[in-house]
Protein backbone atom coordinates (compact mmCIF):
# COMPACT_ATOMS: atom_id res chain seq x y z
CA UNK A 1 0.00 0.00 0.00
CA UNK A 2 1.30 3.42 -0.98
CA UNK A 3 0.17 6.04 1.50
CA UNK A 4 -0.54 9.66 0.62
CA UNK A 5 -3.22 10.21 3.27
CA UNK A 6 -2.53 13.94 3.49
CA UNK A 7 -2.72 14.53 -0.26
CA UNK A 8 -4.95 14.14 -3.24
CA UNK A 9 -3.54 11.84 -5.90
CA UNK A 10 -3.72 12.22 -9.68
CA UNK A 11 -3.83 8.82 -11.37
CA UNK A 12 -2.53 8.93 -14.94
CA UNK A 13 -3.54 6.32 -17.50
CA UNK A 14 -2.13 5.66 -20.95
CA UNK A 15 -5.23 6.78 -22.88
CA UNK A 16 -5.99 10.11 -24.50
CA UNK A 17 -4.42 12.97 -22.57
CA UNK A 18 -5.28 16.64 -22.58
CA UNK A 19 -2.23 18.21 -20.94
CA UNK A 20 -4.33 21.02 -19.47
CA UNK A 21 -6.46 18.43 -17.68
CA UNK A 22 -3.32 16.93 -16.15
CA UNK A 23 -2.00 20.33 -15.08
CA UNK A 24 -5.33 21.23 -13.47
CA UNK A 25 -5.67 17.85 -11.77
CA UNK A 26 -2.19 18.17 -10.27
CA UNK A 27 -3.12 21.56 -8.80
CA UNK A 28 -5.86 19.80 -6.82
CA UNK A 29 -4.14 16.44 -6.32
CA UNK A 30 -0.37 17.00 -6.43
CA UNK A 31 0.92 13.43 -6.11
CA UNK A 32 1.10 11.78 -9.54
CA UNK A 33 0.70 8.02 -9.80
CA UNK A 34 1.25 6.50 -13.24
CA UNK A 35 -0.57 3.36 -14.27
CA UNK A 36 2.04 1.23 -16.03
CA UNK A 37 2.96 2.72 -19.45
CA UNK A 38 1.55 6.10 -18.44
CA UNK A 39 4.90 6.59 -16.69
CA UNK A 40 6.47 7.20 -20.11
CA UNK A 41 3.59 9.54 -21.01
CA UNK A 42 4.18 11.53 -17.83
CA UNK A 43 7.90 11.96 -18.55
CA UNK A 44 7.20 12.88 -22.18
CA UNK A 45 4.99 15.72 -20.90
CA UNK A 46 7.45 16.96 -18.26
CA UNK A 47 6.10 15.21 -15.15
CA UNK A 48 7.86 12.67 -12.94
CA UNK A 49 5.40 10.38 -11.16
CA UNK A 50 5.76 9.63 -7.46
CA UNK A 51 5.03 5.98 -8.21
CA UNK A 52 4.26 3.52 -10.99
CA UNK A 53 1.67 0.81 -10.42
CA UNK A 54 0.65 -2.02 -12.71
CA UNK A 55 1.74 -5.22 -14.38
CA UNK A 56 4.61 -3.31 -16.04
CA UNK A 57 3.91 -4.73 -19.47
CA UNK A 58 3.73 -1.31 -21.14
CA UNK A 59 6.31 0.89 -19.41
CA UNK A 60 9.69 1.14 -21.14
CA UNK A 61 12.86 -0.33 -19.67
CA UNK A 62 14.47 3.05 -20.30
CA UNK A 63 12.04 4.64 -17.84
CA UNK A 64 13.19 2.38 -15.01
CA UNK A 65 16.86 2.91 -15.85
CA UNK A 66 16.46 6.69 -15.64
CA UNK A 67 14.03 6.72 -12.70
CA UNK A 68 15.09 3.78 -10.56
CA UNK A 69 14.39 5.68 -7.32
CA UNK A 70 10.63 5.83 -7.90
CA UNK A 71 8.18 3.67 -6.01
CA UNK A 72 7.20 0.69 -8.16
CA UNK A 73 4.35 -1.61 -7.30
CA UNK A 74 4.46 -4.56 -9.68
CA UNK A 75 1.31 -6.69 -9.79
CA UNK A 76 1.53 -9.46 -12.36
CA UNK A 77 -2.07 -10.66 -12.24
CA UNK A 78 -4.08 -10.00 -15.39
CA UNK A 79 -7.60 -10.14 -13.94
CA UNK A 80 -7.81 -6.37 -13.32
CA UNK A 81 -6.79 -3.20 -15.14
CA UNK A 82 -3.86 -1.05 -14.08
CA UNK A 83 -6.36 1.63 -12.99
CA UNK A 84 -7.96 -0.89 -10.64
CA UNK A 85 -4.52 -1.80 -9.31
CA UNK A 86 -3.88 1.90 -8.63
CA UNK A 87 -7.16 2.36 -6.79
CA UNK A 88 -6.61 -0.72 -4.63
CA UNK A 89 -3.02 0.11 -3.72
CA UNK A 90 -3.04 3.82 -2.92
CA UNK A 91 -4.41 5.28 0.30
CA UNK A 92 -4.99 8.96 -0.43
CA UNK A 93 -7.24 11.77 0.72
CA UNK A 94 -8.92 11.61 -2.72
CA UNK A 95 -8.06 10.68 -6.30
CA UNK A 96 -8.53 12.14 -9.77
CA UNK A 97 -8.21 9.90 -12.84
CA UNK A 98 -6.81 11.35 -16.08
CA UNK A 99 -6.09 9.47 -19.32
CA UNK A 100 -8.09 6.34 -18.65
CA UNK A 101 -10.45 6.77 -21.60
CA UNK A 102 -9.92 6.64 -25.35
CA UNK A 103 -7.30 3.93 -25.78
CA UNK A 104 -8.41 0.33 -25.18
CA UNK A 105 -12.15 -0.24 -25.07
CA UNK A 106 -11.86 -2.98 -22.42
CA UNK A 107 -9.92 -0.65 -20.13
CA UNK A 108 -12.28 2.22 -20.90
CA UNK A 109 -15.33 0.18 -19.94
CA UNK A 110 -13.63 -0.99 -16.74
CA UNK A 111 -12.76 2.61 -15.83
CA UNK A 112 -16.39 3.63 -16.27
CA UNK A 113 -17.67 0.72 -14.20
Predicted regions: what they are:
Residues 1-3, 31, 44:
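Short secondary-structure boundary/capping segments within folded domains
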Residues 2, 23-26:
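Glycine-rich helix-loop-beta junction characteristic of Rossmann-like nucleotide cofactor-binding loops
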Residues 7, 25-33:
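Short beta-strand/loop segments at the ligand-binding rim of alpha/beta enzyme cores
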Residues 1-16:
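N-terminal nucleotide-binding beta1-loop-alpha1 segment
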Residues 28, 37-113:
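Acidic/Gly/His-enriched mid-domain segments of enzyme catalytic cores or analogous surface patches
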Residues 13-24, 38-41, 45:
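N-terminal active-site wall of soluble small-molecule enzyme domains
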Amino acid sequence: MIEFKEFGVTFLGGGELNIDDLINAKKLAPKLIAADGAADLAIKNGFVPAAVIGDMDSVSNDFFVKHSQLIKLHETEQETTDFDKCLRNVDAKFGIGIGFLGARIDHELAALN
